[in-house]
């Protein structure tokens, strides 16, 4: 019966290739005093089967709060690692201070929204009260005059209007025509109008035939033809524009309107793009349904300005007044957006591995969001799918008590199809809803079940038809669908997001906008932190390799002693520099637990098994027992010495001795393995799942791998907490997930070996059906995973502090990833590649 273990491999040279589209970034040597070299170019390769008999993993942790390292090193061989760790963390602090001086979090406010020429033009067209011959906002007219490009276009920052097939080409066309209409409305900027019309005329005819519809502003097919008709009515002569061209645009609009008329969500979308419809829309009716408390229509300045022009809407005017007062002479394409901006920033910091450096800022942002969630007073959050789903996910995962009822309005597929998001084929909204739906903590959260079902279906449809929105990377959609959040290793996720980070990546509404202020700062900070961590990991791996050799573990010919494969998952989840000692101990215990498992499973005689059990039972009095073989002596002394080392280090953190608990965990493990060995020798089959799991949970070996390192991560872990029911339940549900996931993967092999397995044990109650038995086992896994997640995020009345609960959840994530039934990490090549990406391979980051 398998326990959790990693197989490792030996190093060989690897040459990193530089592609034309990527730059290989290496760590700055100045960050590290002891290691000024770049991350090693050595990679891990193997001719061995990484999981020769069983797949199991060492424990891993992601502690969001900075865990204190109070224990001094007690081994001289670790001093260099300790110093490297301190210097690496100091570098992060220095960089963080520099970024704070540059207001890195400015992008998380509405002040960080860039100007939208398109929306500014519509605001500029609003007439003054009582005098329709002058503009209400002359400063917006001035801004238009001052911000025309040399080619005659207007458009979002970073865009190019040279050709309509460029990513922001249609945006430039729509923005330019809107600015021309605004200037013509007030007979201003004759030369600007001429140049703008020239740009539109030279580029718009090919617009119908070229470019990807995903690059078009939302509503382009309705709004641009509508503005074109208005320009003609105003007597504007557009160069190169023939009647055939005009007819083509009218057909484009008619086709879009006919498409919308066939859907139940057409009213919302037609109101959103109403500036392209003019007097055709019933503005009073639209105001009754879609005007928000702040006076806006959909938080869109352009739509709201059109309502003020066509409907004499006082609330719309007050919204526009406040908007111009806030932003000055230009306006953004959406306002307010502060809630989304804050949540987007928190999410980005987490995905890039930077959240530890901004704990107080993140807490402040989430506290603000939670207050709004409870008060239900934030229209931006409650009405916008992306914002609402992201708020739910981040709040729940950070321990805030939020109900899935907040997403009930999005429970059906029609809620998406009938919305502006659905009409715009908004991938981001779908993706956020899908990610939120995975954070299910009770079986009866059917809202999340329903959302997960239809959002996954639509995301797959978008991938299959190549309709993923430009604001979302298609690879991100594929990754999220393939790997649920409970199967991810944090450092691999950080690397992926850093490398795929879209500097200048834009969100497309009626005009493109982006959170531009944080791009370079975020990537720079993330790259430096990742590379300094890699240098530390390499030092730790070198130490562990030396330790295994000095402990003579390689003399155990039956054992899988593979430092790299046992270390890398710990680095991937327990990635923080200050957790160095916990990473090292966890890796040691995983190697030792693997060796113990191999002794009981394939390598040891009955005498050796019983001898090891007796030695661990006697512990400090082991000399009275003696060693029946050199192999048992090597293994016991490694366990004993490592445990004493842990106890000495833990004393400085816990202010008490933990050696009795440590010895107890090892004793429980070998007794359980001895029981399984006796079952196998006697051909005994447990009479029930309860009898089987009572032994099998313990024999999976997560006690030494997970529980012991908890003493090193801080804060204090009192004896009363270790013995409390909550702690035992956390351990139980983690063990259930690990053991049963392993059983699903190994039942065929163990059936041939005559060993018992939960799948084989359950099958008889289903008439011998293996598939039915597997379904029952999967349901048990799902129930334990759900309960473990509930215990992680439930802060009320929690006895076990969050950093320790996080450890149990991280191990649950690890076993889910490595025991996925589609064998995503079952091949040596894939596992080696993942290990290299965490420990050795430098980042390949897109140029900013």
From Swiss-Prot:
Coiled coil: none annotated. Residues 1-64 form a transit peptide. It is an enzyme of class 4 (lyase). Binds 3 Mg(2+) ions per subunit. GO terms for cellular component: chloroplast. GO terms for molecular function: lyase activity; magnesium ion binding; terpene synthase activity. It is found in: Plastid, Chloroplast. Mg(2+) 1 binds at residues 597, 601. GO terms for biological process: defense response; diterpene phytoalexin biosynthetic process; diterpenoid biosynthetic process. The keyword Signal does not apply. Keywords: Chloroplast, Lyase, Magnesium, Metal-binding, Plant defense, Plastid, Transit peptide. CDD domains: Terpene_cyclase_plant_C1 (cd00684). It comes from the Eukaryota. Mg(2+) 3 binds at residues 742, 746, 750. A motif (DDXXD motif) lies at residues 597-601. It catalyses: ent-copalyl diphosphate = dolabradiene + diphosphate. The Asp-Asp-Xaa-Xaa-Asp/Glu (DDXXD/E) motif is important for the catalytic activity, presumably through binding to Mg(2+). Involved in the production of antifungal dolabralexin phytoalexins in response to biotic and abiotic stresses. In response to fungal infection and in associtation with AN2, is involved in the production dolabradiene, a type of antifungal phytoalexin. Converts ent-copalyl disphosphate (ent-CPP) to dolabradiene. Belongs to the terpene synthase family. This is Dolabradiene synthase KSL4, chloroplastic.
